[in-house]
Every structure is written in structure tokens, then in C-alpha cells.
Amino acid sequence: MAQNGIGTIHKLDMYSTVTNARFNITQLISEISYYESLESPTASMTISILDATDFKHSVPILGNEQLLYSFSDTFDDNVRLFGGMRLYKLANAMRIKRDTDSYDLFFTREHMVQDQYAVVEETMGPMLASDMVENIVRGIMKSTKMLRCEKTEGLTVTTFPRVSPFTAIDMIASEAKSARANSASAYVFYETNKAFVFSTLDALFEQKPVRTFYYLENQVKSDNAIESSRILSLEQPRAFDMMGGVASGQWGVKISSIDTISKTFASTTHLYGKSFNDTGHADGTTPLVSDQTQKELATKITREKLLVTSAGRATNAYVLSKTPDAAHQYRRRTEFAGREIVSLSSLMSSAIKIAVYGNSSLKAGDMIEIFIPATGIRKPGDVKNKLLSGKYLILAICHRFRGDGTYITTIECAKDSFSTKLSGGDF
């Protein structure tokens, strides 16, 4: 029977590197924490163990053990989290009572372990940056996992100086310009249980929400379906950070570039309001700051960045007469760096964390909608908190399964716009 907050562990088998024997460790767990994040190229897992059988020494656990897992919530439409990982660290071991030890096992994907050994030392191109990512995932990492790759604009040539595959992808992400119109081209590369994803934040924000969650008072009774959408706890670690925005370039950034071949110098200025209006958003067209704040803070440059580029030669007649390919094979970062810096700084200035009943279908990169009721003095018809309610992008997610069967999902998420206007009496 489906129950909110209850999970099912279908498989949790670890294989010894000494005897190749298989051990089901379900009865030993205190807690399983499965993590995904837009800031990490791989998923990971931590398992807290309560060991009263000296399992650690009898196996023995020496590192690099393989773990095969499968778990989910208990609803009929559940999506299983499943796959394999490698044990890379045992830590926090202590004797908690006679003949009983506790310790934590840290697992990561096989490709993360291999990433420390694999080397990318070649020149790729001319080709799309998105195709380079696919070449690395398929050709160097030898991964057959699904890959979702947002297409990039323009052919480019990149030389990788003996770096790991994930470092190479980071290099590509920092230079890739999205083929989408008016994109800030802030690319991220991350892993979910199902796929690798190479995408811009713009594209992620423009997805439709997969689920709506409600911050209901505890005394409100509801049926099982509504209860599954209840927010159990809500925390706002940062609502805004004005001084941090000044330092990071949220309000205004100047991008200067020099092309040493064509001997040209150029500069562009990007202010918060213009960059906001130039890109797409999840919830509407209202920035997260007031017009007055923009007038006071977003009219001057607070950060400057100098880039060495090859963009100047793309329009230089002499260079083009000698190397025609320069017209479309050049470094494009100067074309989007300002919008990217402003967008990323704005995104990281605020975030909220919520806990909900375990939901194995949620993953990093999903959009969700959050409804928070209005409190205090309010206008007739106001039913929701207009500042906090809205559409959010999941930046990081943790699925927590406890030994007693309890299953909770914790989410860190952020929004990039308001759905209602700050002026005109909406607030």
C-alpha cells in the first residue's frame, strides 16, 4: 500500500574485492543519502552503517567495492533510483556501544573514479562545442548512459592540455555559446540517475514544473494525494545579498577583449535590467529587485573582466583573405560573457531549501512550483505569499532513506523572476 514518507529498498548489494562475494547490506543501514547537483558532474551516495556483526573486518571492506542499488517511493507511478557505484572512502568510524560500531561509506560513480586516470590531450574541431561534449562522454569516458545535450552555436577548435574528461567538459562549458536566441549561455554539466545533461540554465528554467508543493499548516487535514505534495519544512538560507552582488557583478559588468592577431580591442557593458530583459525566465518578466534598487545599484559597473579572444579576426578583411575559416571559427565568449556573469550572480544571490515526503521521480534540473500561503495583514483575495511562491529550479537534491523505512527528499532550489509586478499595488 502506498504511504507518504515511506520508501522501498529493492536492492542494496555490495561485492567484496577480496572474495567477489555478494553481501546484502539492507539490514545494516542507518541512513542512505543519494545526491544530485547541478554543480557536480556525477551523482553520489553516502550510507551510514550500524555494525554489530563486525561486517567491516569480516568482509573485509578495503575500498573500491561495487554497490548495486535500487530504491523508490511506494506509489504506483514511482520511478526507481537504480544503478551501480564504487566505494571510495570509509570515514567517521566509532564504537557507539559494546560490540557495535558506526561508520559512513562514501560511494561515487565508476566514471568518476576513472576520470582521475583518463586524460584528454588532443585538439578537437572544427566542430560544435556540444559535439565535443558528446565525443568526450562516448569516446573517452566510454559511457553508454543517455546524454541530453543542448546544441551550441558555431564551429570551434579546442586543444585540451592533458586534463581529465570532466575538466575538459568544464573548459567547453565556459566557452560554449547556446544556439538558442537571447540565451545567457550559462552551461552546466551534471548527472541524474537517468542521464548526463549539458544544458544552459535558461533552458532549464523554461521547463514546465513537474510537481507543485504546498506549505500547509500542520492542523490542516488533507487526503493522501494532497498530503504527498506537502512541504514538511522550509528554510531560506539567503533571501538576497546586495553586497555579494556588487562584488560578483550582478548589477553591472564590463567585458573587455583583445585580439592579438587582428590587433583590435573592444568592450561591452551589461547591466542587470538589460541582461534580465534579454533572456527568458521561468515565472514572468519581473526581476527579483525593485526599480528603485536597479536605479541605485544597476547603473554602474562593479566588475570588469578582460578576455583574450579571436573574435576580431572574424570581421577583419586581411585575416579573412588569408584564413577564410576565421569567419566562423573563433572564440565566442565575448558575445555572452556579460549576460552569463549577471545571470549567474543573480541566481546565486537567493535560494530556499525544502523537505518533502520522499519522491523518487524528482531529480536535479527539474522545475517545481511552490505555493506558500499569505499570512499577516493582506488584501482581499490574496491567498499566497507572492514573494516566495512561484516556479523554482532544483539546484541540488538529496533522497534520504532511513533504516526504519522513512523516506524524505530535501531540495535546494532557486527562482529567477516574480510572476507578479512589484509595482502597481500587486504587493
Stretches found by the model and what they are:
Residues M1-Q66, S70, L105-M112, R148, ...:
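Juxtamembrane "anchor/assembly" segments of surface/extracellular structural proteins
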Residues T26-Y35, L87-A91, G154-T156, K221, ...:
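A broad structural signal for short, well-ordered beta-strand segments within beta-sheet-rich domains
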Residues D54-L147, V157-T158, A173:
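Surface-exposed cap/loop segments at beta↔alpha junctions
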Residues L68-D73, A129-I136, Q219-I231, F240, ...:
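Short, cationic low-complexity segments
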Residues G83, Y103, S185, T192-K194, ...:
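Residues that flank catalytic or metal-binding motifs in active/ligand-binding sites
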Residues S102-L105, R109-H111, R148-M243:
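Short beta-strand-centered interaction patches in the first periplasmic/extracellular domains
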Residues Q116-V120, P209-T212, L422-D426:
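Short, charged, solvent-exposed linker or helix-capping segments at domain edges/interfaces
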Residues T200-E206, Y215-S345:
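Extended, domain-scale alpha-helical bundle/helix-rich regions
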